[in-house]
Amino acid sequence: MTEQIQERTKAQQYNFNKLQKRIRRNTGQAIADFNMIEDGDRIMVCLSGGKDSFTMLDILISLQKSAPISFSLVAVNLDQKQPGFPAHVLPEYLESLGVEYKIVEEDTYSIVQDKIPEGKTTCSLCSRLRRGILYRTAKELGATKIALGHHRDDILETLFLNMFYGGKMKGMPPKLVSDNGEHVVIRPLAYCREKDIIKYSDMAGYPIIPCNLCGSQPNLQRQNIKQMLNDWDKRFPGRIETMFRAMQNVVPSHLADFELFDFKSINKDSGVINGGDIGFDKEEMPVATVEDEDMVQEFDPSLKLDVTNI
């Protein structure tokens, strides 16, 4: 019996190490691709107590130990005084890690409850208040970058939300300047899959704090988009990866935004632009390869992307 437990423990540790390596590699690649972290940076890691931010802090600590540059981390949590919030959990966890941290106490819960009618979602106002407090805290701490735990699925969901409900082809940038113009915000998990983060978080045993202590309901539109993408991921292996790659291979001349591309000046002397267009025939859609080491099944040609049935 003891041998079976030991063997199972070894197998679990192997799987954990393998998953950590993949998340670490994806995070490191995103940091490099977007120059998220530079020598001498002081990174304020926003820690909500959820799986994403716990994983982000864990991986950044790991990368910090072997990075060719020097940077420091300070974890920050905003205690918004929501009923039932376990205020002791994060300080105890962060103390055990030996990482620098700051708990900011601001009763935004009462403000939101006072301003938002009962039954209405509080997320929008809560988010604005939280953002302002975190910007202020970053300045107080002398942070050069603010790290958020959004992952690849969040980025894709935002793209489809904006297309379906906002009429914009706009996602969630891996790196940006904050809306007050004073901070650089980074998303180190931009290349990481949510399902990997969920699995990794479960294996790591983080002291997860529920995100719905305020009683607010999740955004229904985002939930619908998430369900749609999860369904595609199950039915059409590789589609999610291909869509994310598409966000990195934008061809403005083959879209319709005349602010991004000068269509008006095109004439027959302009030459072929970005490969041109076959014009009168339907373009053959290439079957993209699935770049996922966990997918061992053969790709079924019958699952080839049909752009008329999405």
From Swiss-Prot:
Annotated motif PP-loop motif: location in the chain? 48-53
| Catalytic reaction(s) noted | cytidine(32) in tRNA + S-sulfanyl-L-cysteinyl-[cysteine desulfurase] + AH2 + ATP = 2-thiocytidine(32) in tRNA + L-cysteinyl-[cysteine desulfurase] + A + AMP + diphosphate + H(+)
Gene Ontology cellular component annotations, sorted alphabetically: cytoplasm
Recorded metabolic or biological pathway in which this protein acts: tRNA modification
The main enzyme category here is transferase
Instruction: Indicate where this protein resides in the cell.
Output: Cytoplasm
The main location class comes to cytoplasm
- Cofactor descriptive note: Binds 1 [4Fe-4S] cluster per subunit. The cluster is chelated by three Cys residues, the fourth Fe has a free coordination site that may bind a sulfur atom transferred from the persulfide of IscS.
What cofactors are annotated for this protein?
Answer: Mg(2+); [4Fe-4S] cluster
Q: Which UniProt keywords apply?
A: 4Fe-4S, ATP-binding, Cytoplasm, Iron, Iron-sulfur, Magnesium, Metal-binding, Nucleotide-binding, RNA-binding, Transferase, tRNA processing, tRNA-binding
Indicate which residues the UniProt annotation says bind [4Fe-4S] cluster: C123, C126, C214
| GO BP annotations listed | tRNA thio-modification
Keyword Hydrolase present in the record's keywords: the answer is no
Q: Quote the subunit structure annotation.
A: Homodimer.
Tell me, what does this protein do in biology?
A: Catalyzes the ATP-dependent 2-thiolation of cytidine in position 32 of tRNA, to form 2-thiocytidine (s(2)C32). The sulfur atoms are provided by the cysteine/cysteine desulfurase (IscS) system.
What more the UniProt record tells us is: The thiolation reaction likely consists of two steps: a first activation step by ATP to form an adenylated intermediate of the target base of tRNA, and a second nucleophilic substitution step of the sulfur (S) atom supplied by the hydrosulfide attached to the Fe-S cluster.
Q: Check the record and name the NCBIfam families matching this protein.
A: PRK10696.1
**Family to which the UniProt record says this protein belongs:** Belongs to the TtcA family.
Protein known as: tRNA-cytidine(32) 2-sulfurtransferase
